[in-house]
């Protein structure tokens, strides 16, 4: 039996949170299809949603606009629900080049991808959890609306073993091969198995740290246990186990054979069409490619690009929506769309771009027309499939405003902080005025965010402030997610005082140390200076008691006027609440941690420890060393760094390099 959702937190709902939780829960119980949680920055939206989930006790899918925010939400939910299944479902590609054809230059681009093994495991773990447990929360990106294997076929392929079962060893090995597991007697890795006499060791595709041991005696399952694949230590015996497939795209043999029959029929029709149109090159190309795929499917059960035949594999008719993560959800599931003003347009835009690329592939004989049904959901299909929904945003978009049966406001922060004071200053002196403001904030150990309209302006501004001895960094779209997280962490740690950006200083950027947000050229009406953009950007200063937003403008646009009026409305409500309850505002205190994997790291024994705790322990270890021991340790770390570099493991090499620099810079000073 599944556990109940159990929220673990040292905080109790306060401010506007109790009434918001009550209204959301009442709305869900009354059967409202759509609700909006309009929550200002720092009001505890995540905590409010966590409380609502605990009260309604329903499995939940949370959609985020990007991987960074998904990782942040995942970390927080794992802290709130340590006893429940909190899962992470994002795109597993580190690099993805879709299959495409450019007719103008007659260039065919083959699909090329690099799959992140760890994220693939987390995706499989997510679908396993939602099929086995009611107490599941999945944090996902728009990857959730892309085609996934058919849930019915996937669940039919499960391998169930119970202690005492009569089963031939060869039958188990055959079933593992059907699940696309490979035999590897030398090294036990994810989605592999090894055989040693009557013992079969299986490393499940969805497992991160545990493998399964099946002990047979005379065609009878004598023992089933979980063990540590690294140390071989037995962890626990169990009466039964279920082994899940290596991929979501596995299909029972009989369905594969019927799929091949359907592909043959479609191929024959399409070849005839191409011949009549005198497209002989396309005809020959399509026949050769499709027959090769069919041969692979017949022999191995899969082929490269098998998802292009997903219409037949999942038994759908032409034009029907593909099976997605939403199809794996139980009927009583709850959907939460975070930063909905960004996520909703994303959900609507995925289908069209995918369709245009595939139509070209079909037209020029690279794919059968049925490949068009390997696609993300259209927005109207998503709406039909979506369970009861809660939108979360500080600035809901027109869709949420139109659809919502109820808007629940979360204006008051538990810390008593009020929205930043807003000031409008002239554009003519904006750079010099900003320079004096930055120096004031830096002297108080506070940080500044500056947003510009163009890349050129951001670069020039960064250069100018650097010349005037301001510690400044520039955040732009070419910086990848990991580096972006590092820059934000360095800003919080005080490595520099000012961060310049264009459109990157908005949703979900959680930096309590920021006391000033400066918006240059605020009167240039447009996407970057719309009412929503201004409210989101100004909100970045709302986590600090000295929070202030300066808008540099020569006139007040309609967007500025509406944004300032909304901010003033919120300030009045917040001040009135503070006065009534005698609350003195105080800045949010938040430790600087790594966000992916919930600020957790594995020790060699496979147990979770806090990242900050590990760093503190390491520092204490180095401080206790003699100079000779320290020199030896540094040499060892340098060897480790070069070893990683030689193996092209550049991220690991960079991490060791940073560690060496940290020891030399900080700990040697302590020695002196």
Swiss-Prot record:
Short motif (Beta-hairpin): ranges: 92-115
Entry keywords, A to Z: ATP-binding, Cytoplasm, DNA damage, DNA excision, DNA repair, Excision nuclease, Helicase, Hydrolase, Nucleotide-binding, SOS response
Binding site for ATP: 39-46
Gene3D superfamilies: 6.10.140.240, P-loop containing nucleotide triphosphate hydrolases, UVR domain
Residue ranges of every copy of the UVR domain listed in the record: 631-666
Residue ranges annotated for the Helicase C-terminal domain, each copy included: 430-592
Ranges of residues in domain Helicase ATP-binding: 26-181
PROSITE patterns xrefs: HELICASE_ATP_BIND_1 (PS51192), HELICASE_CTER (PS51194), UVR (PS50151)
Compartments (UniProt record): Cytoplasm
InterPro entries reported for this sequence: Helicase/UvrB_N (IPR006935), Helicase_ATP-bd (IPR014001), Helicase_C-like (IPR001650), P-loop_NTPase (IPR027417), UVR_dom (IPR001943), UVR_dom_sf (IPR036876), UvrB (IPR004807), UvrB_inter (IPR041471)
GO cellular component, one term: cytoplasm
One GO process term, biological-process aspect: SOS response
Record Pfam families: Helicase_C (PF00271), ResIII (PF04851), UVR (PF02151), UvrB (PF12344), UvrB_inter (PF17757)
Protein's UniProt keywords contain Nucleotide-binding: yes
Listed transmembrane segments: none
Family stated for the protein in its record: Belongs to the UvrB family.
HAMAP family listed in its UniProt record: UvrB
Comment on protein domains: The beta-hairpin motif is involved in DNA binding.
The protein's name: UvrABC system protein B
Gene source species: Coxiella burnetii (strain CbuK_Q154)
């Amino acid at each position: 039996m599944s556990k109940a959702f159990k929220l673990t937190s040292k905080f109790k709902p306060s401010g506007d949170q109790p009434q918001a939780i009550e209204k959301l829960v009442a709305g869900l119980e009354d059967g409202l299809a759509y609700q909006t949680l309009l929550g200002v920055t720092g009001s505890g939206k995540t905590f409010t949603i966590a409380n609502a989930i605990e009260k309604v006790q329903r499995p939940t899918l949370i959609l985020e606009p990007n991987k960074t925010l998904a990782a942040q939400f995942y970390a927080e939910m794992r802290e709130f629900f340590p006893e429940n299944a909190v899962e992470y479902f994002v795109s597993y590609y580190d690099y993805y080049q879709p299959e495409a054809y450019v007719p103008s230059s007659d260039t065919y681009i083959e699909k090329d991808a690099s799959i992140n093994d760890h994220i693939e495991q987390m995706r499989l773990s997510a679908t396993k959890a939602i099929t086995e447990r009611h107490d599941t929360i999945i944090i996902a990106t728009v990857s959730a609306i892309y085609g996934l294997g058919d849930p019915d076929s996937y669940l039919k392929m499960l391998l169930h073993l119970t202690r005492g079962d009569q089963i031939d060893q060869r039958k188990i090995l055959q079933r593992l091969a059907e699940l696309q597991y490979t035999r590897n007697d030398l090294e036990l890795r994810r989605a592999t198995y090894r055989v040693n006499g009557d013992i079969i060791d299986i490393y499940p595709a969805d497992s991160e740290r545990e493998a399964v041991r099946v002990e047979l005696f005379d065609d009878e399952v004598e023992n089933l246990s979980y063990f540590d694949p690294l140390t071989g230590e037995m962890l626990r015996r169990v009466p039964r186990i279920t082994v899940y497939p290596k991929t979501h795209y596995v299909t029972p043999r009989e369905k594969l054979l019927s799929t091949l029959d359907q592909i043959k029929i479609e191929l024959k029709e399409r070849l005839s069409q191409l011949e009549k149109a005198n497209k002989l090159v396309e005809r020959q190309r399509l026949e050769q490619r499709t027959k090769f795929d069919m041969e692979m499917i017949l022999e191995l059960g899969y082929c490269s690009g098998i998802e292009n035949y997903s219409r037949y594999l999942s038994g759908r008719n032409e034009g029907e929506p593909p099976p997605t993560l939403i199809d794996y959800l139980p009927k009583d599931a709850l959907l939460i769309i975070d930063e909905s003003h960004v996520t909703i347009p994303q959900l609507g835009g995925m289908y069209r771009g995918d369709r245009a690329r595939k139509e070209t592939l079909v037209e020029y004989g690279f794919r059968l027309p049925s490949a068009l049904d390997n696609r993300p959901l259209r927005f109207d299909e998503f709406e039909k499939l979506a369970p009861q929904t809660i939108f979360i945003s500080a600035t809901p978009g027109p869709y949420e405003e139109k659809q919502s049966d109820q808007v629940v406001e979360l204006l008051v922060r538990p810390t008593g902080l009020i929205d930043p004071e807003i000031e409008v200053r002239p554009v003519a002196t904006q750079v010099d005025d900003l320079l004096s403001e930055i120096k004031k904030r830096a002297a108080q150990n506070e940080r500044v965010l500056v947003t510009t309209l163009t890349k050129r302006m951001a670069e020039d501004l960064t250069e100018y402030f650097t010349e005037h001895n301001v510690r400044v960094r520039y955040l732009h779209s070419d910086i990848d997610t990991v580096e972006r997280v590092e820059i934000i962490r360095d800003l919080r740690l005080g490595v520099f005082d000012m961060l310049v950006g264009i459109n990157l200083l908005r949703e979900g950027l959680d930096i309590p140390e920021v006391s000033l947000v400066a918006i240059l050229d605020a009167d240039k009406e447009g996407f970057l200076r719309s009412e929503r953009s201004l409210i989101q950007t100004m909100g970045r200063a709302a986590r600090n008691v000295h929070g202030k937003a300066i808008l540099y403008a020569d006139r007040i646009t309609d967007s500025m006027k509406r944004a300032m009026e909304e901010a003033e409305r919120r300030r009045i409500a917040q001040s009135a609440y503070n006065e009534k309850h005698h609350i003195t505002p105080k800045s949010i205190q938040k430790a600087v941690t790594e966000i992916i994997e919930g600020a957790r790291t594995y020790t060699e024994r496979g147990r979770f420890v806090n990242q900050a705790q590990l760093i503190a322990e390491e520092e204490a270890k180095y401080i206790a060393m003699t100079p000779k021991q320290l020199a030896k340790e540094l040499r060892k770390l340098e060897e480790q760094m070069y070893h990683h570099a030689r193996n092209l493991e550049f991220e690991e090499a960079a991490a060791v390099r940073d560690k060496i620099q940290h020891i030399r810079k900080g700990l040697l000073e302590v020695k002196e």
